Amino acid sequence: MKEKVEHIVDWITDYAEQHNKKCLVMGVSGGIDSSVVSTLSAKTGIRTIPIVMTIKNKDMLALEHAWWLEENFENVSRRIINLEKIFHEFENASRYLGADSEHAFANSRSRLRMMMLYQVATSNNGLVVGTGNKVEDFGVGFYTKYGDGGVDISPIADCMKSEVYKMASYLNILEDIQDAPPTDGLWDDGRTDEDQIGMTYDDLEKCMKQDEMGTIVTVKKDLHKLETYKKMRKQNMHKMNPIPVCDMQKFR
């Protein structure tokens, strides 16, 4: 695990130096992915700004991790910002227009946070560092388009969720964070990732590997999970594919 961690830290460092960027900015939610990414970023020695952004939620784990980072790394400057008032105004305007989908509001929370991250990063000649893992980013597309999917670099997007947990253990991430059920923190009711997806990350990893290898699945329970995985992947491919462009070649 030491070699993997050092490889990612070196990769982040090299990218920042090649593009003459002076800081690393990321959202911290109290989840395993953002905790690992913010710690890997801090280990580069580059100025690191982890931001806790509350909107109708105040995750103590996010605050504890941000404090832990600042205590353990001299190059870390944590930030805590309450976006509730801003989002409340947006919510009122949306409802006035009849655009009151709770799913859309959940995505808008993610996009508002993305705006804040880029405001801070651009103001400090920095990079927005993504926190998505391979299962989310390239398996089922479990992220918000132009929200948490809007980043400059993605250090753990080639790491399975199980690998992220191993990194968290190696990096001594707070045990409460390692033990907490994964959640995107975008819903008022506090629903977990498993509540939304209908499967655990272990199941998703297994299905992702089966799909990539073309494994023939005959057990009914496993077949249902694989079909669920494929359905979600198909629905979200628009996030993973380039934006469709109307081809005008025949007019040239």
What are these regions (language model features)?
Residues 1-142:
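ATP-dependent adenylation/nucleotidyltransferase module used to activate substrates
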Residues 1-28, 32, 36-40, 49, ...:
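Peripheral terminal appendages
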Residues 45, 73, 172-175, 211:
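Conserved NTP-handling cores and scaffolds of large molecular machines
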Residues 46-48, 68-75, 99-102, 149-155, ...:
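Short, structured secondary-structure boundary patches
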Residues 63-67, 115, 162-171, 202-205:
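Residues on a specific face of well-ordered alpha-helices
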Residues 74-81, 104-112, 155-163, 201-214:
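Short, basic, helix/turn surface patches
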Residues 105, 109, 127-200:
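Catalytic subdomain that performs nucleotidyl-dependent activation
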